Amino acid sequence: MKKFLIITLVLCIGFAAFAQQGEIGNPDATRIGIETAQQMIREVSVDKFEHEGFWRSRMSSDNGYTTTRLFLGAPANKSVIAEEEGMDIPDIYVLGTRIDFLRRGHHSFTIYPVRPIPIEGITKTISVWVAGRNFNHELFVLIEDFYGRYYEFSMGKLNFIGWQRMTVAIPPAPEDGISGVIQGSRHHHGNFGITIVGLRVNVDPMEARGSYYIYFDDLRAETDLFTEHHRDADDMADGW
């Protein structure tokens, strides 16, 4: 009987751990950082990678060189954002980056916009479609918070075939309003949000050879726009 109880307990713990792992790549935006009784969660487009030259790439010239350009194409399983239904919004390109390695090592390369991209509201998740060519490299999203502080979050390994939507949750800020990723100020209702400053790939040194290709499409965010939609229109703007 005692042995049976121990086995049951181990299985329950294992199931709980598995359930937590399953949320890493598909977090529920409605359950992340609930700080108010009301939320207005919306999926918004951050960038569709439709403008040549807006995204660039770089890596140390000692380790290799990069080339970035647009290609016609799209993930077959990509869905349209509900608010964009019926709108004539261009969405025919994907962003491709080629890396030519000069030597093996613990390298990384960055894909970044020519100017940072702000996200309105309190961001819950960030997602992007990626074709990673089944390498053990790791993708990170790079952001700045309300105070301009830099953070990076792993979106996962690129060891899959074809297109996959990769998602990461942005951790809610602690109650002190100082530490962690701060997305706004409790003293006023303007300028809430974080800013996307780039994507970085950390290279597996065992696969840092020859040429490597990676493609991106449809950078999105799930964000709470309740404060943005309910602030007073006659409120004064600070910062003068």
Give residue spans per PLM region.
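Positively charged n-region of N-terminal signal peptides that target proteins for export
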Residues: 1-4, 20
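Sec-dependent N-terminal signal peptides
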Residues: 4-13
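Single-residue recognition of alpha-helix boundary sites
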Residues: 13-14, 228
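Sec/Tat signal peptide C-region and signal peptidase I cleavage site
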Residues: 15-19
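Beta-rich carbohydrate-recognition modules and glycan-binding surfaces
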Residues: 20-240
